[in-house]
């Protein structure tokens, strides 16, 4: 039941990224799927020519199992845990039958915009087929975003739901309509100093900065992370250039960073933020940090041969990089 947070951010370019919070790593890699890599599907014809994709994937049997990715057109998509609510079906005759692990490649290989993705999803049936015996079905829901709009996609027992996502963030449970509704409880929070509306005849004092957001959840539960990252993202201010935008994006997601020791699982292990990503979806650059490496590492898809046929893979740089000044 690992937890994660995804967010979008727009300055002059469009940014999309996520945290992966878990107790161990599968050796995921920054993986580029070039335009002529043959994408095979269990129940659909292969796609041999498509948009190039860059993202974080666990590669098994030369297939990119993407956790989050963008394509060369600037569309981003991430899968986040949705345990207990995700529901996948047997094949249906009049639908595009797509396995859950094929969903990100299916959309990002063919769609340039969220609108195009929405049209494909209206015809889709997500299958309860695992990738392999070693890699069981992941119970997920998804955020899909371009620079204009975001949607959340949830495959639940009564079908596939497509929600408009006006905040451009996603965590885990509960279902997305309930997540959005919970923001009503925090509409009084502000980035400004509060005025005394408690009682006019009491002389109440602002004894600290930041009191306008007292009540913003600080714990690591998925509902609380949703509220917190939404507040941080919606109030975010930064410069427009690349370094300032990327730096600010990592600050947004670091507001829900999981430190080892704060979230103990029943088996005694601890959930941590294994990696944090930030994609410049406009320029096709994938930036990331890991739990032990604060230095931002980048892979630029346009420095590769995007007309190739083979996956291009970069293992994560995980050790801390410290820049000595003397």
Question: Predicted regions: what is each one?
Answer:
Residues 2-15, 129-130, 137-138, 147-149, ...:
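C-terminus-biased signal that marks the final domain/tail of proteins
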Residues 20, 81, 146-148, 157, ...:
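Short, flexible loop/turn elements at secondary-structure junctions
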Residues 22-24, 83-85, 158-161, 168, ...:
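Short, surface-exposed beta-strand-loop junctions and turns on beta-sheet-rich folds
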Residues 94-130, 242-250:
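Proteins synthesized as precursors that undergo proteolytic processing into mature forms
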Residues 118-154:
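Aromatic- and glycine-enriched pocket-lining scaffold segments that form the walls
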């Amino acid at each position: 039941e690992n937890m994660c947070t995804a967010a979008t951010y727009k300055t002059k370019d469009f940014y999309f990224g996520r945290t992966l919070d878990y107790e161990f790593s599968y050796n995921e890699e920054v993986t580029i799927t070039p335009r002529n890599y043959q994408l095979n599907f269990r129940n659909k014809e292969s796609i041999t020519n498509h948009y190039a994709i860059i993202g974080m994937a666990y590669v098994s049997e030369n297939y990119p199992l993407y956790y989050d990715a963008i394509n060369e057109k600037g569309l981003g998509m991430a899968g986040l845990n949705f345990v207990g609510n995700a529901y996948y079906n047997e094949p249906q005759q009049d639908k595009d039958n797509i396995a859950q692990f094929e969903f990100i490649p299916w959309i990002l290989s063919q769609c340039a915009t969220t609108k195009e993705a929405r049209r494909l999803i209206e015809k889709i049936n997500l299958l309860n087929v695992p990738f392999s015996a070693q890699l069981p079905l992941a119970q997920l829901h998804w955020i899909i975003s371009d620079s204009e709009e975001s949607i959340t996609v949830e495959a639940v027992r009564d079908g596939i739901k497509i929600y408009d996502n006006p905040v451009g963030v996603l965590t885990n449970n509960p279902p997305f309509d309930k997540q959005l509704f919970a923001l009503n409880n925090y509409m009084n929070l502000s980035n400004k100093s509060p005025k005394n509306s408690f009682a006019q005849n009491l002389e109440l004092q602002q004894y600290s900065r930041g009191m306008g957001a007292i009540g913003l959840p600080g714990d690591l539960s998925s509902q609380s992370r949703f509220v917190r990252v939404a507040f941080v993202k919606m109030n975010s201010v930064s410069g427009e250039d690349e370094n300032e935008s990327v730096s600010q994006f990592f600050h947004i997601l670091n507001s829900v960073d999981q430190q080892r020791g704060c979230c103990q699982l029943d088996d005694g292990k601890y959930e941590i933020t294994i990696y944090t990503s930030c994609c410049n979806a406009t320029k096709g650059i994938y930036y990331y940090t890991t739990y032990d490496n604060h230095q931002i590492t980048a892979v630029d898809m346009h420095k590769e041969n995007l007309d190739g046929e083979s996956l291009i893979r970069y293992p994560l740089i995980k050790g801390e990089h410290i820049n000595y000044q003397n």
